Each structure stands twice: as C-alpha cells, then as structure tokens.
Amino acid sequence: MAPINPDLQNVQDDIKNVIQDLFQVLVQVSNYDAAGRPTRDVLAQDIQTLDKTLHTLHTNAQHLPTPTADKPIPEPLIQYVENGRNPDIYTREFAELVRRMNQLARGKMHAFRDFRDVLAREMESALPELRADVQMVVGATGGRTVGGEGEGAGQGEGGEGRGEGGN
C-alpha cells in the first residue's frame, strides 16, 4: 500500500475532528435549556471549538497538492467532454488507436527480424570468412544461429523459436 502524504493525513484528522465537534454541538443543541446559563456557555464554547477546527482544516487543506498535479487530464479529453461527447467513447477510440499502433510496431519488428535473418544467411553464404562475426551480430540482436553450414544457418531451431524470444 502506498504511503499516505503527511498533509493528507493531517486533513483527514482535521475532518474527523470537525465531525466530532459537530456531534458535540448536536448534543448541546438537543440538551439546550434556554433558561439555564451553563448550557448556553457550553454551546457557545463548542461552536467556537468547531470554528477553530474548521479554520485548521481550511489551512491544512491549502497545503494539499491539486488532484490534477498528480494525474493530468489530457486536453483532447477535456475538449471532447466540453463538446458534449461521451468520455467512454474517447477512451475506446484511444485504446483502438494504441492497439493499431502496437500492431504496426510489432509488424515492423517482425519484418526487421526476418530481414536480419535473411541478410545473415546471405552474408554467411556469400562471405564464409565472416560467418563468426555474422553469428555474433545475430546473437547480440536477439536472433538464434545454428552453427551448421550453408543455407540452414539461421533457420531450423532458430527459425522455429523466433516467436518466443523476439517479441
């Protein structure tokens, strides 16, 4: 559980005190005797205590950060709501946009991964003296290489397992 902000804790305590003082005033009002002097003084004292507690609450509440300081609301969402539209629709459209962008990025990642493997295979077949360097680069970029000769290097086990580690 996240730690509670000390200012927030003070405000919570002040609210509890206000509720307690309101209860005390309620008790004094329900037992009020217009002819009796002690009840009038006690009620006045409880109202003054309530006033001080409310003042303390107001002072401590001024030190709290604004809610938007922690979680800013996107300006397009504010405009969307001000134009009388449903924020749930905005959220759904935003989620769909993010999903499409993620699919596009994933497609690019797969295309580059496949290009890396094809390029490595072609470089190994055309420049066999660079095979160790090519395998080192493919391994460093998340690909799997098979130490075999010719066209099979870069396919086989590595080609089948790409969907697991490269995503």
UniProtKB/Swiss-Prot annotation:
Region (Disordered): 141-167
Domain of life: Eukaryota
Keyword Transcription regulation among UniProt keywords: yes
GO MF annotations, alphabetized: transcription coregulator activity
Subcellular location: Nucleus
Compositionally biased intervals (Gly residues): 141-158
Pfam families: Med10
Single GO cellular component term: mediator complex
Keyword terms: Activator, Nucleus, Transcription, Transcription regulation
GO BP annotations, alphabetical order: regulation of transcription by RNA polymerase II
Subunit structure of this chain's protein: Component of the Mediator complex.
Similarity section: Belongs to the Mediator complex subunit 10 family.
Function (record text): Component of the Mediator complex, a coactivator involved in the regulated transcription of nearly all RNA polymerase II-dependent genes. Mediator functions as a bridge to convey information from gene-specific regulatory proteins to the basal RNA polymerase II transcription machinery. Mediator is recruited to promoters by direct interactions with regulatory proteins and serves as a scaffold for the assembly of a functional preinitiation complex with RNA polymerase II and the general transcription factors.
Name the UniProt record assigns to this protein: Mediator of RNA polymerase II transcription subunit 10
Gene source species: Chaetomium globosum (strain ATCC 6205 / CBS 148.51 / DSM 1962 / NBRC 6347 / NRRL 1970)
Encoding gene per record: NUT2
